């Protein structure tokens, strides 16, 4: 019995004026030799460690609040509180404190909280040691009472004495009786005085007075007094709102009357603090600290009582997931959980952990999966709020659930896919819900909060799951708005600029911008998973179609996606960009923007400036060789001239290097087979092909088996010779200005190889042959050649090989026809 009676929680007040839970234990009062006095000791019930050792100081002001709380300050800005499980235990310790200080245990405050200057004045005015004499509680004295209450607020000593006087004489209930009389008599002046009186009593900041004012008997009359603000022409109707508009709904009947009363009281007190009372000035901000604590401890108590009632929570979950539950009832159940989770935010971390683990064990995530798919907007919004609490609490818990779920369910009903679909289908024109859901998804796929243990790595497991089961749902709107059949139609028309697939609908553009933001996050934080996906789906080409959108913010999102990819300085990505000629839509956007100096212009130039500064050789060569003539007229920045300089410097270096190599070695360079990829890249490709059944980089369809590929030196020479003959036959015709015109009509399959199985042919670009039969410089890393049987074969060329090949200065340089 004594254990239960002395069971307490220890709280300290932090810098944000919020109570931090320091642990649960058992309190005792004993003489401590080291401290030379009676002290309060709290030992943890878990391991017996000392949670608190505090000497009962004769001059410290202790307060007893709500029958089960003792609060005091040990030093400046260091407040402590003991929250007792039982009133009897609180009374016992309170008596010990009062005994040490020589006080009557019936008082709620043992000392006046006074500073030195106040104490000096206090000693000079012995008459203040008496309690304040209150005027008789009658109508004619209301003005005098109001003046008294407002006058003491500036003095801590007088506030304390007034609070004691009000408590001892039962004065508040008498005032509230006068309020009823004034309302019956329409005594407006008296009602205005009562507003000042009740507001002033609240600012006394005394828990004992709050207990009276917020009791069932008094609280509505207190609210009534606060309706008659003299500054308002007409009184507010707070009581009408609380009694008629704000309805208390018991989704499951609450049998505990104390719990029900506590819920009512907390709602009404919160309403007083948030709605009725004016925002306190900088001089009044500490006047209501006890009111904040009152609400805080009430919420802690409510959550604890509900959490301990397993029958109640089990019934709530059962009805929430029952198909027979009607929509109205389900809406109420979801709203209850939303409020329940909101209250849980008042708990300390360890208590919040226990709270959410209780919900998880009862099945909160499967329940959310059901309600998030409902048509009711209110239900979905409330479910999203609950989901956000869970993700914030433990992303790992949510990830573990969805991976287990994937073993038993289809992709379309997985929780994460339900969340993605809600994001995509958000009917809000501003996509407020979609933005919230996107943030939650980003938290779930963020490797920074994923765990790595000796037995398993959450990161690799979850990302494998996400890219296999969820990524296609996320990118569906993007791929639908940049669909392949429309791209092919655009290619027939001759220019990607005639594209009709760019969404002009503002809401769709916003959604695509959100999806791109998430994909950009993936590029930054995921490795081979997103690389694999981008190359298999030719995703960057699809994204860059959005550069044509009339919504500049969407074009910038598309550009940002490409910028992040280039920022990785990954040659895999660089080869993909070069082979797909993916700078063309970016340069078209720059040229279309004309002389306008805007964010799009600056962002595009910054991308090319990054390539120049970082000296990304493969991209520099590709840009200069294919686009420089279109860009050389841009002189307001030196970026493009700088790229040309970089290109020429590299070309000179390679020429010098080549001239220093004996001719016999140069000729031998042509007798080697295509080099293998780096081990890790080759391993990655092989793994991917096994898992996905698709090739990643080669820009051709696999129309033949591996047996048809050239084997050994002889076949390699045959295919090389066939390629050179084809080059001579396909030389472009010279234009009147001496240049060459190329129209790039890359299909999706030309960029990503075997991904597009329906394509009958693949567009490939082969450089014109020089006079000596060797291939001219071509920065594309993969070249399409025809074998004797007519099959298309992908060979890997490297820039350094091509740099070493001989070429004549008269060899024409290919240049695309850019859309105007």
Curated annotation (Swiss-Prot):
Biased composition (Acidic residues): 798-809
Residue ranges crossing the lipid bilayer per the database entry: none
Residue stretches of biased makeup (Polar residues): 750-761
Compositional bias ranges of the Basic and acidic residues kind: 701-711
Region (Disordered): 687-711, 750-820
One Pfam family, short name: EVH1_PP4R3
A GO MF label: protein phosphatase regulator activity
Gene3D superfamilies (UniProt xref): Leucine-rich Repeat Variant, Pleckstrin-homology domain (PH domain)/Phosphotyrosine-binding domain (PTB)
InterPro entries: ARM-like (IPR011989), ARM-type_fold (IPR016024), EVH1_PP4R3 (IPR055236), P4R3-like_central_dom (IPR006887), PH-like_dom_sf (IPR011993), PP4R3-like (IPR051137)
Top-rank lineage group of the source organism: Eukaryota
Domain named WH1: residues: 1-100
GO CC list: nucleus
Biased composition (Low complexity): 770-784
The protein's role, per its UniProt record: Regulatory subunit of serine/threonine-protein phosphatase 4 (PP4).
Assembly and oligomerization: Serine/threonine-protein phosphatase 4 (PP4) occurs in different assemblies of the catalytic and one or more regulatory subunits.
Assigned protein family: Belongs to the SMEK family.
Database matches in PANTHER family: ATP SYNTHASE GAMMA-RELATED, SERINE_THREONINE-PROTEIN PHOSPHATASE 4 REGULATORY SUBUNIT 3B
Identification of the protein by name: Serine/threonine-protein phosphatase 4 regulatory subunit 3
UniProt source species: Xenopus tropicalis
Gene: ppp4r3b
């Amino acid at each position: 019995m004594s254990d239960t009676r002395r069971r307490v929680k220890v709280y300290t007040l932090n810098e944000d004026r919020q109570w931090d839970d320091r642990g649960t234990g058992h309190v005792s009062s004993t003489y401590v030799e080291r401290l030379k006095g009676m002290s309060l000791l709290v030992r943890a019930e878990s391991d017996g460690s000392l949670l608190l050792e505090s000497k009962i100081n004769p001059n410290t002001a202790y307060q007893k609040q709500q029958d089960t709380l003792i609060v005091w300050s040990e030093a400046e800005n260091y407040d402590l509180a003991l929250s007792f499980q039982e009133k009897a235990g609180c009374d016992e310790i309170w008596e010990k404190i009062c005994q040490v200080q020589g006080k009557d245990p019936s008082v709620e405050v043992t000392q006046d909280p006074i500073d030195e200057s106040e104490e000096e004045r206090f000693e000079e005015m012995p008459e203040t040691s008496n309690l304040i004499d209150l005027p008789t509680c009658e109508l004619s004295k209301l003005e005098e009472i109001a003046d008294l209450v407002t006058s003491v607020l500036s003095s801590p000593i007088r506030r304390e004495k007034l609070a004691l006087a009000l408590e001892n004489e039962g004065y508040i209930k008498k005032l509230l009786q006068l309020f009823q009389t004034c309302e019956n008599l329409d005594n407006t002046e008296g009602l205005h005085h009562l507003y000042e009186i009740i507001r002033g009593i609240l600012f006394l900041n005394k828990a004992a007075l709050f207990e009276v004012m917020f009791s069932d008997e008094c609280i509505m009359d207190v609210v009534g007094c606060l309706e008659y603000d003299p500054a308002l022409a007409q009184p507010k109707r707070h009581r009408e709102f609380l009694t008629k508009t704000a309805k208390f709904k018991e989704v499951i009947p609450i049998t505990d009357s104390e719990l029900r009363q506590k819920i009512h009281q907390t709602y009404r007190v919160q309403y007083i603090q948030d709605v009725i009372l004016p925002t306190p000035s900088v001089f009044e901000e500490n006047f209501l600290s006890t009111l904040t604590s009152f609400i805080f401890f009430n919420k802690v108590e409510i959550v604890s009582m509900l959490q301990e009632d397993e029958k109640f929570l089990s019934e709530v979950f059962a009805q929430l997931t029952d198909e027979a539950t009607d929509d109205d009832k389900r809406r109420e159940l979801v709203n209850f959980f939303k409020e329940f989770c909101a209250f849980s935010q008042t708990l300390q971390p360890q208590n919040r952990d226990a709270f959410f683990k209780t919900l998880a064990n009862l099945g909160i995530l499967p329940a959310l999966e059901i309600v998030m798919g409902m048509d009711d907007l209110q239900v979905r919004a409330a479910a999203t709020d609950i989901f956000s609490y869970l993700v914030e609490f433990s992303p790992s818990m949510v990830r573990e659930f969805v991976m287990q779920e994937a073993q038993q369910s289809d992709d379309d009903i997985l929780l994460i896919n339900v969340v993605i679909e809600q994001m995509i289908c958000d009917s809000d024109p501003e996509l407020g819900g979609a933005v919230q859901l996107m943030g939650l998804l980003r938290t779930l796929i963020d490797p920074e909060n994923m765990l790595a243990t000796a037995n398993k790595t959450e990161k690799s497991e979850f990302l494998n799951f996400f890219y296999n089961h969820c990524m296609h749902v996320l990118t569906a709107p993007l791929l639908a708005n940049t669909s392949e059949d429309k791209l092919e139609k655009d290619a027939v028309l001759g220019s990607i600029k005639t594209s009709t697939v760019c969404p002009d609908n503002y809401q769709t553009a916003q959604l695509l911008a959100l999806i791109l933001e998430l994909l950009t996050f993936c590029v930054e934080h995921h490795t081979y998973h997103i690389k694999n996906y981008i190359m298999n789906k030719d995703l960057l080409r699809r994204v860059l179609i959005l550069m044509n959108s009339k919504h500049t913010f969407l074009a910038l999102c598309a550009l940002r996606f490409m910028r992040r990819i280039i920022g990785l300085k990954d040659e895999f990505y660089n080869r993909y960009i070069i082979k797909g000629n993916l700078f063309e839509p970016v340069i078209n956007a720059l040229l279309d923007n004309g002389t306008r100096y805007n964010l799009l212009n600056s962002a595009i130039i910054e991308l090319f400036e990054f390539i120049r500064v970082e000296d990304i050789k493969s991209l520099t060569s590709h840009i200069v060789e294919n686009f420089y003539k279109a860009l050389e007229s841009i002189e307001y920045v030196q970026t493009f001239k700088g790229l040309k300089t970089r290109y020429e410097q590299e070309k000179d270096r390679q020429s010098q290097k080549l001239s220093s190599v004996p001719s016999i070695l140069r000729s031998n360079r042509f007798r080697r087979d295509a080099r293998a990829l780096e081990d890790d890249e080759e391993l990655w490709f092989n793994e991917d092909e096994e898992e996905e059944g698709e090739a990643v980089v080669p820009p051709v369809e696999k129309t033949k088996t591996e047996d048809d590929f050239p084997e050994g030196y002889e076949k390699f020479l045959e295919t090389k010779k066939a390629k050179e003959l084809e080059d001579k036959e396909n030389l472009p015709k010279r234009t009147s200005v001496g240049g060459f015109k190329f129209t790039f009509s890359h299909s999706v399959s030309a960029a990503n190889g075997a991904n597009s199985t329906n394509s009958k042919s693949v567009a490939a670009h082969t450089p014109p042959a020089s006079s000596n039969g060797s291939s001219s410089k071509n920065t594309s890393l993969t070249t399409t050649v025809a074998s004797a049987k007519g099959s298309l074969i992908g060979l890997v060329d490297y820039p350094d090989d091509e740099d070493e090949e001989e070429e004549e200065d008269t060899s024409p340089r290919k240049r695309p026809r850019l859309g105007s």
